[in-house]
């Protein structure tokens, strides 16, 4: 996440690994902003690995996708036995409080949660 916003062509990658028995809360400083695209796709890939007995609270602020943005986000969570993950991905299409709507563009979101090579979600 960058507080300044994401534009077409940006590639963000985040890999977080919790050690056994760790307890962590991760959030963001502000809402994520995905601005109008220059015809290139912006992409964010997040991979969370939670070791045995660890607990991760993944609670970023919402992502605002502006009109004419082209954006894809992928989230993968890998849980060891006894690991706990609590999380969300909140997406707002346009800034509705300002009367702005998402009328054109593309937004794709993909979330996977795995434990011991078995998909849970």
Feature map (PLM): residue ranges:
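Conserved beta-strand/loop scaffold segments within soluble protein domains that form the structured core
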Residues: 1-121
């Amino acid at each position: 996440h960058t507080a300044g916003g994401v534009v077409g062509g940006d590639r963000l990658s985040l890999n977080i690994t919790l050690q056994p028995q760790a307890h962590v809360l991760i959030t963001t400083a502000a809402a994520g902003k995905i601005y109008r695209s220059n015809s290139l796709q912006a992409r964010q890939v997040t991979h969370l690995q939670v070791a045995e007995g660890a607990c991760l609270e993944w609670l970023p602020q919402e992502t605002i996708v502006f009109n004419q943005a082209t954006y894809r986000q992928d989230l993968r969570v890998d849980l060891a036995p006894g690991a706990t993950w609590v999380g969300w991905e909140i997406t707002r299409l346009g800034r509705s409080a300002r009367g702005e709507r998402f009328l054109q563009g593309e937004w794709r979101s993909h979330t996977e949660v795995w434990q011991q090579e078995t998909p849970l979600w």
